[in-house]
């Protein structure tokens, strides 16, 4: 039952995912829209799917592989195109592709999928080529294809929608993709002229994999003598250990040896070193499991003892948009392959488990191990010399029982409401000498998250919208060359180049420190936030604190204020701009905090302050503060200061004679203070209204606070047209016309309701009296009376069919006037006699029913 634990964890995750998602919400501190920061773009009209990126650090050139084209652009400014070459599909191939049921407009094209360095003067390029994958060599000098047209089967996918990955190792291409047209035969292969290898076509080896990443880890100088280089493949596949009604996906890491040459008799031209293990990325305390692998990045840095794998995961049932980042050390991965237990296929009754741990003897040399000095000492100099027993064991047991666990046994980052697609990681040194890992993670909506791994937390520094449209980022590339650090992102529409930091966007020392960006520091000398490692000046005196402590920011700049004049009874809007998503905006007036619950105040966008019904008591100084909590400490900084003065505007009645002589311009000047409700200046001559200037400074207080006045540009114009504020007396005719129209409409509706009878009973009597004189109105029970008459007449009709005479209907008491004249009034005795003469079959069905069945005749019994 131990093997069912991962599955139980997955099902538990599916149950608690909605409950636990709320807790995983690290919000980016800053959000940059597409036009707010300096981004460089490259796009060629008519070309799409920029999914292959390759950097040449020596030449400062970025190679871009797109649909039917390859470009070379300047790595420092990708908008500068250097070279281009097109690789289009012939019409004949397009027609043959369309005959196979594929789209001629979208699928039967040449999508560049492999773009790898072959030598210093050439690139190895492969494309889907209308479902006929083809590879060629691209000469970098002439930037033209050499026309080799090699078969790309097993190196490049047939379908552009199928997964793929590749890496060039020593001039040999290692790739993971599909091997046939349908994509039903997955393969991990090595393209070599002297020793090509591939995986066994068997479900235990690869079961519907989705390839994500591949890279080579060279042997360590401190490792055992004679150790071989290893190539790692990362993918997600359908589980072979468990079987359910749905396909359970499992993330894997597989390893092959560079020196593998296949077996002599068993596993000929097949990998003899292929082993795979499960990757664990889960939160133990919540049971949340992330089992869909999206991307992997290998972090290599001089300060690291060994490479670290950073991987992006999402849950299989990701209906709430959860993503996670887990990190794995190379030693942990190698320990599973070199010392871990194997699994074997078994049938367990009444269980979903299909594979269990193998506890039997393991052959020597160890199956799946690379040829090292120990194997050579035992005369196993090559995989061709390995015994069949070892090779058969590898063929039957490619899956490891032990799993690869992440660092600290938990994800580095869990983020909700986002789907991460790609990741790159940079290791940088802060001002205090500490090294930090900074992750750049792209989303399926074209955004880039930047997060730094601190001692006890992961801080999401910022979110940058790379593309105007919310399109997924297909690939990420990091250039960490000293003095030139950029992130390149490719999507379906183009490529975007972004710097690793936007330090210049932080306008104050507090804001620069609170960003907790290891790339940024505050320079008191130039009073600006600068980028580390890119400034030639000395860093002496720079301020940076990764804990967010702003106590070192002693250089307080002079505080400026905005002065406003408003009329009594109006509404004032005081603006405050705060960029941090982690900060809370607080408004203070006379050392007291203003609350939105008060009917006196309101907030626009949780930042700007609205003051209603201004009075003399509202005059004073209003301060907008930003309170941001960092590591159980609240950091407060002043964002804006407003000096508000409320004045009573005297109303002088205009002279009747002078009012007629006034021009439209004089009216505006005299009524300007009344019309100004959003922050106009006090009443001044008309010349001042046309030439606004800075407000007069108030006298300095005894507290000694240095405040520098700031010119106020009102949010509304100083001059308003009178007709936009008041309704002229000459326009009363418009109001009277409107009222008259409403009255006529009311009369029409009333007349229509009277005609249709859609009125209460009293009104109907009044209507009848007016229209019909003394005629008695029709009773409200006329419908009921008619129903009674029809009920009493119907039996007579049936009796007439049987040859009997029809019986007269009962007297209802509502005969017409002519009927009462031509007939006499019946007595009580006659009425009772007529009722007794009614036969049983003439009575209503619901009075007396002796029928056995509803559709039978009464006389048929």
From Swiss-Prot:
Listed transmembrane segments: 734-754
Q: Which residues carry a glycan?
A: 49, 77, 139, 191, 379, 419, 613, 632
Basic and acidic residues bias located where?
A: 826-839
Give the GO cellular component terms, alphabetically: centrosome; ciliary basal body; extracellular space; GABA-ergic synapse; membrane; nucleoplasm; postsynaptic membrane; semaphorin receptor complex
Q: Name one GO biological process term.
A: positive regulation of collateral sprouting
| Sequence ranges on the Cytoplasmic membrane side | 755-861
Got any disulfides in this one, which pairs?
97-108, 126-135, 257-370, 281-326, 503-520, 509-553, 512-529, 576-624
**Could you give a GO molecular-function term held by this entry?**
signaling receptor binding
The Ig-like C2-type domain sits at: 555-636
Q: Name one Pfam family in it.
A: PSI
Q: What does the tissue specificity note say?
A: Strongly expressed in lymphoid tissues, especially in the thymus, as well as in the nervous tissues. Expressed in neurons and glia in the developing hippocampus.
Which ranges are annotated Polar residues under compositional bias?
657-681
Per the record, what ranges lie on the membrane's Extracellular side?
Answer: 24-733
CDD domains given for it? Sema_4D
Instruction: Provide the assembly information.
Output: Homodimer. Interacts with PLXNB1. Interacts with PLXNB2.
- Entry function: Cell surface receptor for PLXNB1 and PLXNB2 that plays an important role in cell-cell signaling. Regulates GABAergic synapse development. Promotes the development of inhibitory synapses in a PLXNB1-dependent manner. Modulates the complexity and arborization of developing neurites in hippocampal neurons by activating PLXNB1 and interaction with PLXNB1 mediates activation of RHOA. Promotes the migration of cerebellar granule cells. Plays a role in the immune system; induces B-cells to aggregate and improves their viability (in vitro).
UniProt lists the family membership as follows: Belongs to the semaphorin family.
| Name of the protein in its database record | Semaphorin-4D
Source species, please? Mus musculus
The gene it comes from is Sema4d
């Amino acid at each position: 039952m131990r093997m069912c634990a991962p599955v139980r964890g997955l099902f538990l995750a599916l149950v608690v995912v909605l409950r636990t998602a709320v807790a995983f919400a690290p919000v980016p501190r800053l959000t940059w829209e597409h036009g707010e920061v300096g981004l460089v773009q490259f796009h060629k009209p008519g070309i799409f799917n920029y999914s292959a990126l390759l950097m040449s650090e020596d030449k400062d050139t970025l190679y871009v592989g797109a649909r039917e084209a390859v470009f070379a652009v300047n790595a420092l400014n990708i908008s500068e195109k250097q070279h281009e070459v097109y690789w289009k599909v012939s019409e004949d191939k397009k027609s043959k592709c369309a005959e196979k049921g594929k789209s001629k407009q979208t699928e039967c094209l040449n999508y560049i999928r492999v773009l790898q360095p072959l030598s210093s003067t050439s690139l190895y390029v492969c494309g889907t080529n209308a479902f006929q994958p083809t590879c060629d060599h691209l000469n970098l000098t002439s930037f033209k294809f050499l026309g080799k047209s090699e078969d790309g089967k097993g190196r490049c996918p047939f379908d552009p929608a199928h997964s793929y990955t590749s890496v060039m190792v020593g001039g040999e291409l290692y790739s993971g993709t599909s091997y046939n047209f349908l994509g039903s035969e997955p393969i991990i292969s090595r393209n070599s002229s002297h020793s090509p290898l591939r995986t066994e076509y068997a479900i235990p080896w690869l079961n519907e994999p989705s390839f994500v990443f591949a890279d080579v880890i060279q042997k360590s100088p401190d490792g055992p003598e004679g150790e071989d280089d290893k190539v790692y493949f990362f993918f997600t596949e359908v589980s072979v250990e468990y079987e359910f009604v749905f396909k359970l996906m499992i993330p894997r890491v597989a390893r092959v040896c560079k020196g593998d040459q296949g077996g002599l008799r068993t596993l000929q031209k097949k990998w003899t070193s292929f082993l795979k293990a499960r990757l664990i990325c889960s939160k133990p305390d919540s049971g949340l499991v992330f089992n869909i692998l999206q991307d992997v990045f290998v972090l290599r840095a001089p300060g690291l003892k060994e490479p670290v794998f950073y991987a992006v995961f999402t849950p299989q049932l990701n209906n709430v948009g959860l993503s996670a980042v887990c990190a794995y050390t190379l030693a942990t991965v190698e320990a599973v392959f070199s010392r871990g237990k194997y699994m074997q296929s078994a049938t367990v009754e009444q269980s979903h488990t299909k594979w269990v741990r193998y506890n039997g003897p393991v052959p020597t040399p160890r199956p799946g191990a690379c040829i090292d000095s120990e194997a050579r000492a035992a005369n196993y100099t090559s995989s061709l010399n390995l015994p069949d027993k070892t090779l058969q064991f590898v063929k039957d047991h490619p899956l490891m029982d032990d799993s690869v666990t992440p660092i600290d046994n938990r994800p580095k980052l869990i983020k909700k409401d986002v789907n991460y697609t790609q990741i790159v990681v940079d290791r940088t040194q802060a001002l205090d000498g500490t090294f930090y890992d900074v992750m750049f993670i792209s989303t399926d909506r074209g955004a880039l998250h930047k997060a730094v791994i601190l001692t006890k937390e992961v801080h999401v520094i910022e979110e940058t919208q790379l593309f105007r449209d919310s399109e997924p980022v297909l690939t990420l590339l990091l250039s960490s060359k000293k003095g030139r650090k950029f992130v390149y992102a490719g999507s379906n529409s183009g490529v975007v180049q972004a710097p690793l930091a936007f330090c210049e966007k932080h306008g104050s020392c507090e804001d620069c420190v609170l960003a907790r960006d290891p790339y940024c520091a505050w320079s008191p000398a130039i009073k600006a936030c600068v980028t580390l490692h890119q400034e030639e000046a000395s860093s002496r005196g720079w301020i940076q604190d990764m804990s967010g402590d702003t106590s070192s920011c002693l250089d307080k700049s002079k505080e400026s204020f905005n002065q406003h004049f408003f009329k009594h009874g109006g509404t004032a809007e005081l603006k405050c701009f705060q960029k941090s998503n982690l900060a809370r905006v607080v408004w203070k007036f006379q050392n007291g905090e203003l609350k939105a619950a008060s009917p006196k105040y309101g907030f626009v966008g949780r930042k700007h302050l609205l003051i209603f019904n201004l009075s003399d008591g509202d005059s004073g100084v209003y301060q907008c503060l930003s309170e941001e909590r960092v590591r159980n400490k609240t950091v407060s900084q002043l964002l804006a200061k407003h000096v508000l003065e409320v004045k009573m505007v005297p109303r002088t009645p205009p002279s009747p004679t002078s009012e007629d002589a006034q021009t439209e311009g004089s009216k505006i000047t005299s009524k300007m203070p009344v019309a100004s409700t959003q922050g106009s200046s006090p009443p001044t001559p008309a010349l001042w209204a046309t030439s606004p200037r800075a407000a007069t400074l108030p006298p300095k207080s005894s507290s000694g606070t240095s405040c520098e006045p700031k010119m106020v540009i009102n949010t509304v114009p100083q001059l308003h047209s009178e007709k936009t504020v008041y309704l002229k007396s000459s326009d009363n005719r418009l109001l009277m016309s409107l009222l008259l129209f409403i009255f006529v409409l009311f009369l029409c509706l009333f007349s229509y309701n009277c005609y249709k009878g859609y009125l209460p009973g009293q009104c109907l009597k009044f209507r009848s009296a007016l229209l019909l004189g003394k005629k008695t109105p029709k009773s409200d029970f006329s419908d009921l009376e008619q129903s009674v008459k029809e009920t009493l007449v119907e039996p007579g009709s049936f009796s007439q069919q049987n040859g009997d005479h029809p019986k007269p209907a009962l007297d209802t008491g509502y005969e017409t006037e002519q009927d009462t004249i031509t007939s006499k009034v019946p007595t009580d005795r006659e009425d009772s006699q007529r009722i007794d003469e009614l036969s049983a079959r003439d009575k209503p069905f619901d009075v007396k029913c002796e029928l056995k069945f509803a559709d039978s005749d009464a006389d048929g019994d």
